[in-house]
């Protein structure tokens, strides 16, 4: 019998949630995703030292101002790691906009353009890039404009139906609803354990997937942030799943049979009128879990971006 990972691939596009090139080679995903935390982790791998040095040299050539050099080096390093990953995956790389811009539409758009330009300068077409943005109202509005320019976006840190609906209405190419972090919140809040079928993160992604398919939205649903393989198996049939190396290995070493759980809609009906900003903010605010986890996620990505910049600043100053 084929291993569980291979059984999953006919139903769902597998994406590697890592910046570790060796892990990507091992599991042969279609796409890969990175974020500030993964870039920070990848920067500590000795084999990546040349990518860091290249980013440092490039930043020095762009400006004499240290603060600008640090920002430029961070952007170039994220793109350098993306370029290495694109040598392996046949599909796309997701590269994230600085989380500290999550509430600034215009700055997010400017940063997205910069990242795309860096990829294009290295010979990579924008069709192979997804720009990751937090699913704040401002991030969703930035994605709407970028999509109209032909720059595809991955809306991340998505924890609620309100966020998912707004992303689809904005024409986002892809969303990344976070399964495991939803589970974490409910376990802490209730003190209960949940089976894979009752897992609140699984239930959330299933609901979003069914809503999108029933209303004919083309936005891709890519489940993310998994805590165990049970969650992954319950979402077989989801458009895409982005999975970290440890769980990819577990799936590869398993022969648990896969049954497609998420299925296309049998009929498509017209969606409701688009949400206003006020509706979005109210509905999102009604979901305490989503409010807490989005804020926490932005803070944590910003912390790791800061740590990365300290490392780069030290190198730039030496």
From Swiss-Prot:
Keyword annotations for this protein? Cytoplasm, Pentose shunt, Schiff base, Transferase
Q: Would the keyword Cytoplasm turn up in this protein's UniProt record?
A: yes
Q: Which residues form the active site?
A: 132 (schiff-base intermediate with substrate)
Q: Could you state one GO cellular component term attached to this entry?
A: cytosol
Transmembrane segment boundaries: none
Identify the domain of life: Bacteria
Principal subcellular localisation of the protein: cytoplasm
Among CDD domains, the record links this protein to: Transaldolase_TalAB
Q: Which reaction does it catalyse?
A: D-sedoheptulose 7-phosphate + D-glyceraldehyde 3-phosphate = D-erythrose 4-phosphate + beta-D-fructose 6-phosphate
Record pathway: Carbohydrate degradation; pentose phosphate pathway; D-glyceraldehyde 3-phosphate and beta-D-fructose 6-phosphate from D-ribose 5-phosphate and D-xylulose 5-phosphate (non-oxidative stage): step 2/3
InterPro entries (alphabetical): Aldolase_TIM, TAL/FSA, Transaldolase_1, Transaldolase_AS
Q: Where in the cell is it found?
A: Cytoplasm
What SUPFAM superfamilies is this protein classified in?
Answer: Aldolase
An annotated GO BP: pentose-phosphate shunt
> Is the keyword Hydrolase assigned to this protein?
no
Enumerate the GO terms in the molecular function aspect: transaldolase activity
Alphabetical list of NCBIfam families matching this protein: PRK12346.1, talAB
Q: What does this protein do?
A: Transaldolase is important for the balance of metabolites in the pentose-phosphate pathway.
Q: How does it assemble?
A: Homodimer.
Family, per the entry? Belongs to the transaldolase family. Type 1 subfamily.
Under which name does UniProt file this protein?
Answer: Transaldolase
């Amino acid at each position: 019998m084929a291993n569980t990972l291979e059984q999953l691939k006919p139903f769902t596009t597998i994406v590697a949630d890592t910046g570790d090139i060796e892990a990507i080679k091992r599991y042969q995903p279609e796409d890969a995703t990175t974020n500030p935390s993964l870039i920070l982790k990848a920067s500590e791998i000795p084999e990546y030292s040349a990518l860091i040095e290249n980013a440092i040299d490039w930043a020095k050539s762009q400006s004499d101002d240290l603060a600008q050099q640090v920002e430029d080096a961070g952007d170039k390093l994220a793109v350098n790691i993306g370029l290495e990953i694109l040598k392996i995956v046949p599909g796309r790389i997701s590269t994230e906009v600085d989380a500290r811009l999550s509430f600034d539409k215009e700055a997010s758009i400017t940063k997205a353009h910069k990242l795309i330009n860096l990829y294009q300068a290295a010979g990579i077409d924008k069709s192979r890039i997804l720009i990751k943005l937090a699913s704040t109202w401002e991030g969703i509005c930035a994605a709407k404009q970028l999509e109209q320019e032909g720059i595809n976006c991955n809306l991340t840190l998505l924890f609620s139906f309100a966020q998912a609906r707004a992303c689809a209405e904005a024409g986002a190419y892809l969303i990344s609803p976070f399964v495991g972090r939803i589970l974490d919140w409910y376990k802490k809040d209730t003190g209960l354990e949940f089976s894979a079928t009752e897992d609140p993160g699984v239930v959330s992604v299933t609901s979003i997937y069914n809503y999108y398919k029933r209303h004919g939205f083309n936005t891709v649903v890519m489940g993310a942030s998994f805590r165990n393989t049970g969650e992954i198996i319950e979402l077989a049939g989801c458009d895409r799943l982005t999975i970290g190396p440890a769980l990819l290995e577990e799936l590869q070493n398993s022969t648990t049979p896969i049954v497609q759980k998420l299925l296309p809609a049998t009929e498509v009906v017209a969606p409701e009128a688009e949400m206003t900003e006020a509706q979005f903010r109210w509905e999102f605010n009604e979901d305490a879990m989503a409010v807490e986890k989005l804020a926490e996620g932005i803070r944590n990505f910003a912390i790791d971006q800061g740590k990365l910049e300290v490392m780069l600043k030290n190198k730039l100053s030496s």
